[in-house]
Every structure is written in C-alpha cells, then in structure tokens.
Amino acid sequence: MGQTLSRADYAALYGPTTGDRIRLADTELLIEVERDLTIPGEEVRFGGGKVVRDGMGQSQVTREAGAMDTVITGAVVFDHQGITKADVGLRDGRIAGIGKAGNPDTQPGVTLIIGPGTEIIAGEGRILTPGGMDCHIHFICPQQVDHALHSGVTTLLGGGTGPAHGTLATTCTPGPWHIARMLEACAELPVNIGIAGKGNASLPAALEEQVRAGACALKLHEDWGTTPAAIDCCLTVADAMDVQVMIHTDTLNESGFVEDTMAAIAGRTIHAYHTEGAGGGHAPDIIRMVGMGNVLPSSTNPTRPYTGNTIEEHLDMLMVCHHLDRRVPEDVAFAESRIRRETIAAEDILHDLGAFSVISSDSQAMGRIGEVIIRTWQTADKMRRQRGRLAGETGENDNLRARRYIAKYTINPAIAHGISTHVGSIEPGKRADLVLWSPAFFGVKPEMVLVGGRISVAQMGDPNGSIPVQPIFSRPMWGHAGRASALFLSRAGLEAGAGDGLGKALIAVEQTRGIGKADMVLNDAMPQIEVDPETYEVRADGELLTCEPATELPMAQRYFLF
C-alpha cells in the first residue's frame, strides 16, 4: 500500500528530489535538483529493515553477469552538466552508469544491478561531485598530496623536483633524469599525477627528450627566460608531440610586451597561468589574454577572491617565491609591479562572466594546495552577493553560476590537458574519482573521497572506539594507495616505456592541440580587454570592471575551529 510523504519527510529519508534546493555550505548559493533518475517507492536504501537485502533490492546476479562493484545510492550528482538525483554504479574503478540501482527481478526500471558482490555507499542527503583537478602544482614536498586529497582534489599536474630553488619558483621538472625520478616518486602517491617538463629552450632537442621521458606538458616560465624564440620552439614541439604548453610570461617586459608574446604564440593553443598577473606575467596588461580565442586562461588561488588582505599578503609571498631581496631596489620594484588591486578586482568579475576558465593553486609558490575548491566557491559567493543572479539563470536557484564555477576545477583543466576522457565529470567510462559532501560542509571538508573507485580518505572517528565516534576528522582509508590512481604521460613517453614497472595505471594525454577558449565549458567568454597603463583600470568591451574587496567570507573560520 502506497504512502504519501511530505517533501521534507521524503528529503530526510531519501535525499532531495526534483525541485528541492540545497544551500552550498554557508554561502548564498542555492542549487536545485533538475531531475531524478530514481523511482519513488523503489529507492534502494541500505540498512537493517531496509531495501538492499537478498531477494529484495539485491539480486542474485554475479559480477561476471553485470552486477556493480559499488553503488552510491540516492546522491545529488553535481558537475558542469547539471544537478541530478541518481544512483551511481562503479565497476573496475570507473563509473559504469548513472541511473536507477536495484534488483531487476523485483523492481522496475533498474539500470544498475545490485548483486551479492556489490558494496553500498549511502549517498542520500549528500552531494556527489567529480574529484577536483589542480593543474598548477609546484612539486615542492610530497606532503602536498594529502592536503590536496583531503580537500577533494584527486588529480595534480605540474612540475618540480622538491625544494630546489628552480622548483620553488617554477613548475618545471627539467630533463629526462629528473622526470624519471619524479615518476618513480609518484608511483606510491594516492592521487593522479602528470609531470610537466621545462619548456624554455630555443632548439627542440632538449624539449623532445623530456616529452619522450614522459612529460605530459611543457612549462614556459619567465625565471628561465620566456623569450619569443623559446615560446615558438616550445609550441612547435608541443604541436608535433601532442602535449600542452603552460606559460608564465615576462613580467619585466624585457624580451617583449604582451603583443610580442601573442605574435610568438601565433594563434597556437596555450594555457596561460595566473592570467591576471599577480602571479606573474606582462605588467600591467597580461589580463588581455583572456580575450584571445587560442588562450586557455587560468587563475591561481591566492587572488581568489579579492579581499581586504589580498594586496598586503601578496607582496611578502612574491619576495619569497621568486628569490627576491628587499635590499635590492629592482627586486622591490619587480614585486610591486605585479600586485595591482585594479586587475585583481577585475579578475573576480571576469570569472563570473566566464572569461577566466580555470582555477588552480600555485602550491607553496604563492598558492595553497588545499584551498582550490574553497576559494573557487568563495569567489562565486562574493560575486553572487555583489552582482546578483546571472542573466541566464532560470528559477529560484543559482544552478548556472554553480555549474560555471565547478567547471573551473573539474572539466576545464581536464580538457586543457588532454585527460577529459578519464577525469573531470561524472559520466560512464570515466575514472571513479569522486567526492561525497554533506551540504553543510560542501567545498570545505569532504565526507569521503574515492580514487579509482576506492575510498581513499574519509571523515572517521576514533579507531579504538566501539563505533566511529569523536574525534572525527579526515583520515586515510584502505584505498589510500598508489595503485588506485594513475600517471598521465605523453603518448611518446608511453610508447618509449616511461613509467614501465611502476605498478601504476599509465594513461596518455591526447587532443591537447587545436583546442581553444570555445572548448572551455561554461567559461568561454572572450571580451575585448583594455588596461589603462597609468591607472591599471580594466575594461571589458568598454565596460569598467571593478568591485569592492570582501571583508568577510563564507567557508572560513567557522569551519576550522578544530
């Protein structure tokens, strides 16, 4: 006999359904469930007296015959595509399907079979997102990995060799020997990793050997000399070998201005790091690159969002990160030329317009690896409060803005670096790198992080408790293992045997060339940017871009009292 439940009672039992709205942490952002792929009255809840029992919601189907390895039940699936209530099935460490789980012998509409070999993760009342991707990593210390993972980031891409001064300043792993050693070091780490080689050279041989050694990208950095000749050489190699190029341009304008850099790039695909300029780049107008169709522009999180403390913090960070000396006037002038409140304020608005496509960290080199997700949503909240609803929103929700911002650290960096076939969204066939959130802690403290379908870290209580009681905090789990994750290599490196013998999944990057701003999901705006060289005021299509610094942010102190 059927029973009618109030919307509130249904949500409390089975999680939100179509039309229900969810507040993200303590922000002003509300997402609304757009569709529900489960069937009312046929929900598969696990537990004593519940549905997932033998002969009820659990079938007799073997794994060989198609039963899932794991089913996440009743979650709100949230990625750039939308917000959907669904069950999610996992097999072989990848997403097998999104739909209705259960027993086809007793239930209608089952698309994901629960069998005796199926594990259940209860997702009712939880939000499920893709694992985040941070594509601006200085590999300074291995302890960064846990800070990223416990924040919900499951893929790291960048360069370095440890706390060498080249790595402290630049995201490059220089040369085949260092690349091989870093691949070995990363084999035991529980996150997906891609290594970037050094791209600063005027002849191709030294770049080609790095790509053959497994580098999945090449990085041009001003501290190594980002000259027009180096830019052209690096992009020529990248086009031939299908790897991405990231660029940190010439702050001092010694070898040319932004126009000269764009001429050297010559319409080819390039990922422009911290395109606002506080992290480095042609002063004061590197931000003009956000309007170029071949440029994939990203931000790093120290300027996200613009607050009353942003300017003061940056000057000290910059002196340390780039090995500068306060006793040298030229070094002080170099630092001050990069920190401009006008362009940082404009960066907030350009993110909200979808002109900046990616947010990353710049880990330990001005940015915080564990705050990519937090600072993305703080930026979204600041813009919601200051600019109101986006023009394209429908209904009483912030779905469009939420989808735009989640794309900045999931699908767009994955597209930019040729790995979107494997990570970046919740779709069948992709790796089961997933993050489960309680809505109250969304973006701040994940409840559970899966890597390759295994629970890697989770909120866990006292291991000696009779039940998992306080103190509860994020701890490594059984899936916190190198074999759960993957290494992303160049195709040339994979064919040359780079990474062989490491006991790790090896995946080649692909289709990194010939893409552009139009491929950046929900973040493909290309306004014409003008920067006043005297006042640093920024205009987009003639409109002045300015906003006040935030004096208070969500997702901050109240979440970190303990």
Curated annotation (Swiss-Prot):
The modification N6-carboxylysine is found at residue 219. Residues 131-562 form the Urease domain. Its EC number is 3.5.1.5. Binds 2 nickel ions per subunit. The keyword Metal-binding applies. Substrate binds at residue 221. Ni(2+) 1 binds at residues 136, 138, 219, 362. The active site is at residue 322. Ni(2+) 2 binds at residues 219, 248, 274. Carboxylation allows a single lysine to coordinate two nickel ions. Its main location: cytoplasm. Keywords: Cytoplasm, Hydrolase, Metal-binding, Nickel. Pathway: Nitrogen metabolism; urea degradation; CO(2) and NH(3) from urea (urease route): step 1/1. It is found in: Cytoplasm. GO terms for molecular function: nickel cation binding; urease activity. One of its GO terms (cellular component) is cytoplasm. One of its GO terms (biological process) is urea catabolic process. Its cofactor is Ni cation. Pfam families: Amidohydro_1 (PF01979), Urease_alpha (PF00449). Disulfide bonds: none annotated. Heterotrimer of UreA (gamma), UreB (beta) and UreC (alpha) subunits. Three heterotrimers associate to form the active enzyme. HAMAP family: Urease_alpha. Belongs to the metallo-dependent hydrolases superfamily. Urease alpha subunit family. This is Urease subunit alpha. The gene is ureC.
